[in-house]
Amino acid sequence: MKTVFKSLLLLHFLLLLLLCFVSPSSFFLLKVPVGGLVACRLRQSQAFMQFKDEFDTRHCNHSDDFNGVWCDNSTGAVTVLQLRDCLSGTLKSNSSLFGFHQLRYLALNRNNFTSASLPSEFCNLNKLKLLSLFSNGFIDLSHNDLMGSFPLVRNLGKLAVLDLSDNHFSGTLNPNNSLFELHSLRYLNLAFNNISSSLPSKFGNLNKLEVLSLSFNGFSGQCFPTISNLTRITQLYLHNNELTGSFPLVQNLTKLSFLGLSDNLFSGTIPSYLFTFPSLSTLDLRENDLSGSIEVPNSSTSSKLEIMYLGFNHLEGKILEPISKLINLKRLDLSFLNTSYPIDLNLLSPLKSLSYLDFSGNSLSPASLSSSSYIPLSMESIVLSLCGIREFPNILKHLQNLIHIDITSNQIKGKIPEWLWTLPQLSFVDISNNSFNGFQGSAEVFVNLSVRILMLDANNFEGALPTLPLSIIGFSAIHNSFTGEIPLSICNRTSLTMVDLSYNNFTGPIPQCLSNFMFVNLRKNDLEGSIPDTFYTDSSLKSLDVGYNRLTGKLPRSLLNCSSLRFLSVDNNRVKDTFPFWLKALPNLRVLTLRSNKFYGPISPPHQGPLGFPELRIFEIADNMFTGSLPPSFFVNWKASALTKNEDGGLYMVYEYDKAANSPVRYTYTDTIDLQYKGLHMEQERVLTSYAAIDFSGNRLQGQIPESIGLLKALIALNLSNNAFTGHIPLSFANLMNLESLDMSGNQLSGTIPNGLGSLSFLVYISVAHNKLKGEIPQGTQITGQIKSSFEGNAGLCGLPLQETCFDSSVPPIQPKQEDEEKGEVINWKAVAIGYAPGLLFGLAIAHLIASYKPEWLVKIIGF
């Protein structure tokens, strides 16, 4: 996957090189600064300045060598316009951009266009030869008729380069699309979008293509047979789609230098002719359903193939013998091939240039791992995870160029050999998930090493923590039995960014240097004392987890200096403090967990307005002593939780903490959190960025549940149980379309269960037990599929799954009356927020009036 990204970055780099060299010699090539035009005609200069004024350019980097304007030497007309990371605002259909009719090359990459769709007026720029709009966040091509003529490119017959990658385009690609009329195209990139359709055979009409990238979309079905027409193509990227069928017919594409088909569903065998292509240097076929043996012709010894990834397939027969003929290989991935016999690494000896090897998930011959065996001395990175290895592979002892070793998830016991630390280039060591219990020789051997990443997770280490290398960047020792105090020497490791010592037996206080790091996890130890109040201004701290210890005192106010903080968990300690309203000043805080401490007092702001925390996604304050009621507008400002699922575009809360350009791998840190979910206590080892959860259970909160909770469309789990909430269940719960778990048990709620809860199609768990609810449980919905105990303790409830039948089951309960009475409570709290400060009462009255008469209209206008 990482190689795919690198390849696509290279692809973009080639595009930019093309942009630099395609300008005809008749052009005036003196680049005009973005800040002012001195060589173009006055009218063109004015038009450009007008175009700039349509956007916010405060963050534009005027020193960026990419940004600029070129003008024709004879006419003075703008012919080349390049602006990246510069423009913020809406690209409108009447933009002055579309008045530059002489434009040949237009690159507006990585800007912040807030417009959802691409204006069709691009088609008026009919002299364009290059159009690059990658990474702009466009999400809609409906106004450009993606399924039809695609007006964006209808008249752009001279276009040679088109890059619309890394946006959010969706829909299907119709064979009649005018895209396929661009017969001059040499470079086409639609990668990283959401286009879902079969691959039209008319791609074969674009027979001048040299680079084609359709990766990371939803293309399905068989690869178009006319691909054999693309005889000029040098780079073909079809990664991460859902393409099926036998291997594509690419035997005519003899100019290929890069062929990427990974993460699809291709089946059959790998054709041997690939290894005869004279220019092929990269072949990526990972994660398909390919089978059979590999046949490499003897003539392939002159092959230029340097990178070959075949992992996660079903290859059979002798694998390494034919591969050993590809003597120019530098990177080889044969992971998880499901072979039925042990693989002998000695067969790699002809590959003298091999620097990267991944054999994970395969059975290796024990003899081939001994010190008497041979693998290329050029090896820099070796991955042998899940290979059933029982002894430390001594074959590594001779690899003086080794930088990265990964032997995770094997069955290796005993101590780590001392010779490992004598390898002069060793920087990345991951030996997690084995049974190591110590280190040969003195643990002080670490100190002067060049090791930057050291991962010791899930082993049997015990005793004091070893002294870490001075060069260490990331250190993780999760799930071991280390004891004693956390050594103060870690405070002297000035490069240390990530330290994870969770799930050990450390005692004593937390070191004072927490703000030196970016990621700190001390969860589930036996630490005591208070959290150090030593976070300095502009601290880079992003994640702090000290849950499940014996910490006391108050939350340190110096956390306010950590403007990058995204994750804060102090759950299951003995912290005694009031609710930290002051944390709302942290602009990036996504997760706040205060569960099971001694926090007390109200959680409503002193002015009784909305709670802050605009980016908050997960808010856990269960099992404390919080009191008071929640004002109606309590949830209005929770903008992140108001997003729909995945609307923020992320996947997991994953942070990269080693970004060195020469790193053979990228190490990341993921947050862990405990949740009460679907009535169960669950530990989430990876937290989705789109996940939103609230847990107020086990406190002393009272009053009505605010209707504004219905704004939090991203909510997946909501737990308000074991409080003293009164009043009716909010009708706005019906807006929580992603809700999966809802617990309101153990309160004093009255009235009926709203029918709207039955429309929540993802709701798999609900409990309203032990309240004062009455009436019939909504029938014919997922609610009736719940267990009986979810509704017990409500004397007035009847209907399935309870045994109590309603008075007259033939007549449905009259719930609309209550809902009509409560409709005045269904207020659009976004409107309340707009006019909240000076005129709360007036705003509530107006919102009440509007919502009562035309709620659908109001919702449409505001966008919920």
Swiss-Prot record:
Signal sequence residues: 1-29
Recorded GO CC terms: plasma membrane
Main location group: membrane
Xref: InterPro entries: Leu-rich_rpt, Leu-rich_rpt_typical-subtyp, LRR_dom_sf
This protein's UniProt keywords: Cell membrane, Glycoprotein, Leucine-rich repeat, Membrane, Receptor, Repeat, Signal, Transmembrane, Transmembrane helix
Membership in a protein family: Belongs to the RLP family.
Cytoplasmic-side segments: 852-864
Gene3D superfamilies per record: Ribonuclease Inhibitor
Database matches in PANTHER family: LRR RECEPTOR-LIKE KINASE (PTHR27004:SF464), RECEPTOR-LIKE PROTEIN 12 ISOFORM X1 (PTHR27004)
Subcellular localization(s) per the UniProt record: Cell membrane
Encoding gene, per UniProt annotation: RLP24
One of the Pfam families matching this protein, by short name: LRR_8
Glycosylated residues in this chain: 61, 73, 94, 112, 176, 194, 229, 252, 298, 338, 433, 448, 492, 505, 561, 719
Species, as recorded: Arabidopsis thaliana
Topological category with respect to the lipid bilayer: Single-pass type I membrane protein
Transmembrane feature ranges: 831-851
Protein name: Receptor like protein 24
Parts forming coiled coils: none
Species lineage: Eukaryota, Viridiplantae, Streptophyta, Embryophyta, Tracheophyta
Positions annotated as LRR repeat: 100-125, 127-148, 156-182, 183-205, 207-229, 230-253, 254-277, 279-303, 305-326, 327-350, 351-376, 378-398, 399-423, 425-448, 449-472, 473-492, 493-514, 515-538, 539-562, 564-585, 586-610, 613-637, 688-712, 713-735, 736-760, 762-785
Residue spans, topological domain Extracellular: 30-830
